[in-house]
Amino acid sequence: MELDAVGKAIVQYHLVPLVHQANLGLEVTMHRVDAHGHLATTAHPQAFGSAQQNHQLRPGFSASALKFTTPVRRDIPALMAYLKGLNTAARRSLDADERLWPLSSTPVLPDDLTNVPLADVDQVSYQRRRDLARKYELQRLMTTGSHVNMSLNEALFTRLYTETFHQQYHSYVDFRNAIYLKVAQGLVRMNWLIQYLFGASPRLAVTDTTSRPQRSSVQHPDGRYSQVTGDYTSIDRYVAKLTAAVRQQQLLSVNDFDGPVRLRSNGQLAMMARQGVYYLEYRGLDLDPTSPVGVDANAVAFVRLLASYFVMMPALPAKMVSQVNAQADQLTRQVLGENPTTASAQAVPAVQVLDALADFVKTYGLPNEDAVLLKQLKSWVTDPKKTLSAQIAMQADPLAWALERAARYQESSNERPFELAGFTALDLSSQQLAQQALTRGVQVDVVDPHANILRLTKLGRSQLVVNGSGTDLNPQALTTVLTHKAAAKQILAEHGVPVPASQTYHTANQLIADYDRYVQAGGIVLKAADESHKVIVFRIMPERGLFEQVVRQLFEQTSAVMAEEVVVASSYRFLVIDSRVQAIVERIPANIVGDGRSTVKTLLDRKNGRALRGTAFKWPQSALQLGTIERYRLDSYHLTLDSVVSRGTQILLREDATFGNGADVLDATADMHQSYVQAVEKLVADLHLAVAGVDVMIPNLYAELVPEHPEMAVYLGIHAAPYLYPHLFPMFGTAQPVAGQLLDALFKNED
């Protein structure tokens, strides 16, 4: 088909890339169900907070329905990543016996549908749901699905209007409306094809075993709870049609219109023609049960491609719109009513449309991913058994099949609780903060995944967070200074707390030359001056050759090394949030404990095989290594990898304990004497820090700290952007909700 004037102008001004850069958002509704597929009887999860404020995770029509809403993204992978994170965060907040129903077809409903619990957000919305239940068929109200919200790139409108179309339209708004209108018309005309390709509800209810299967019972016009059709001839006629339907009591309100395409304004419907269409909402996607999030990126990409196509193609003549829409509605009824396992009567037209789209992609240089997608979709037309609806219809027991998937997706979401799907490029603390934010309805934008920079937005207020806990709650200058260990230690000393004596070296030879001095001192702590997790402790100095080897290896990783006196005590990390100590962990150096039967190697492998152990800073508990230091320590015990360690004997593989070298992390929040808590809180208050990690060596956490014995608490360091994850995933003890506490501090006055 030949391009219209808009399409030709787009080609002339090289604007095709802008056409394809639509802003996309998703709304996905899924039911919470129990292990047998019955609706969950629990209330909307408290973890999601206020339904009025959480616009990302809201209740749907029933109390069991959960509506996921993403922010706008231009990039489909980024959009899907956000939805994955949101879905995973929600799953982890469900009761232990709950999961998300993967089908648009209803799960097991009560015999008496009046017993379906309605969502009770507030009195007004609850009354509206009751009115809906009285007016429409309740089973249809209980079906679910996905909506694609789409707005075209505003730069496209601006450029076209400025260059060419300001003379042909009364206003910029009229021009925008005209483009949106022809895209809406096109999506309505192609609804039958979208449904053929992505329909996934052979029957309205999964428990229905007698009705003839269809391509989509939910999206079929007869499956919609309101039977009002939209008039897409003009914006005025669209508004008039819906307004009349409300006046004639066909609809309770304009929000009840559930046609496949909605024109959405940024205000009242009556003002749409004047204020303009804000975005289009395509409402015709069944849940995809092969995806944990209920949406396949291919479906979103296809809807976007259709929209791009119709932006550049001629609109229907106004006098033909109603007739063509009626024909499209009839075509949709025909295709959706077909047996999904058989060839469609519209297979030839379907292939023709896909071929036309393929030509469009090739001619105007759209991404190759679209060409690959169209080839795949074409195979679904030639072999209908590849379609989702056919796959479901061919199941001997669709209920059991859906339950198996629901259980599998739920289990998968909890396999690695320290990771957040869609956000795994971030560090662990940032992922945990993002999970809590998503759960609470805080929008999470990844500004820079490599630098772990997030922008969190709640009710219009934004906060930047670096490395999971670095925020503007702390003074910027001090935050920068504390990244340098020597400077941080000096600041601690200036505030009157005990710190170990130290000296900073800038070459390996300088440090090696002082070997004899440290032998006389009885030991040494070596720290990379710029990396908190590169620490080596020798309580007894090793032979000179090993010391030289270790020092040179350390200088290969850093430009400066701080040598520090050894403090013999237990190592604790105090986590301060909102100026209060919220969590404390003890760090025990990497070790194995013998059982009288297993070799050292077996004990190492067994400990490293635990669920939360893995690569340092990628897993909550870092794996034990066998490097120079660890082998030296084994030699000091006269052990080899094949030695059997006697029962109950602890072998320390290191004498330092950090989060990155295999240390055991134990929660000590409830055990620590309050005198140490008060001392740490006073220190951070004096420094004007709201968030901090404070490392303290304490011989006895139960003994009261007294001024006469300052050696009872020696401060090793302080961090303005401390790790959150060790407190969320300790090896032993209670996990502390520190990510949520940090969010509370960031948005203290927003609730």
UniProtKB/Swiss-Prot annotation:
Gene Ontology MF terms: ATP binding; glutamate-cysteine ligase activity; glutathione synthase activity; metal ion binding
Region annotation Glutamate--cysteine ligase: where it falls in the sequence: 1-336
GO-annotated cellular components: cytosol
Catalytic activity: L-cysteine + L-glutamate + ATP = gamma-L-glutamyl-L-cysteine + ADP + phosphate + H(+); gamma-L-glutamyl-L-cysteine + glycine + ATP = glutathione + ADP + phosphate + H(+)
Pathway assignment: Sulfur metabolism; glutathione biosynthesis; glutathione from L-cysteine and L-glutamate: step 1/2; Sulfur metabolism; glutathione biosynthesis; glutathione from L-cysteine and L-glutamate: step 2/2
Superkingdom of this protein's organism: Bacteria
KW Amino-acid biosynthesis (keyword) present: no
InterPro entries: ATP_grasp_subdomain_1, Gln_synth/guanido_kin_cat_dom, Glu_cys_ligase, Glut_cys_ligase, GshAB_ATP-grasp
E.C. number: 6.3.2.2, 6.3.2.3
Pfam annotation, one family: Glu_cys_ligase
Broadest EC class assigned to this enzyme: ligase
UniProtKB keywords: ATP-binding, Glutathione biosynthesis, Ligase, Multifunctional enzyme, Nucleotide-binding
Keyword ATP-binding: yes
Assembly and interaction partners: Monomer.
Database matches in NCBIfam families: PRK02471.1
Family: In the N-terminal section; belongs to the glutamate--cysteine ligase type 1 family. Type 2 subfamily.
Role: Synthesizes glutathione from L-glutamate and L-cysteine via gamma-L-glutamyl-L-cysteine.
Name of this chain's protein: Glutathione biosynthesis bifunctional protein GshAB
Protein species of origin: Lactiplantibacillus plantarum (strain ATCC BAA-793 / NCIMB 8826 / WCFS1)
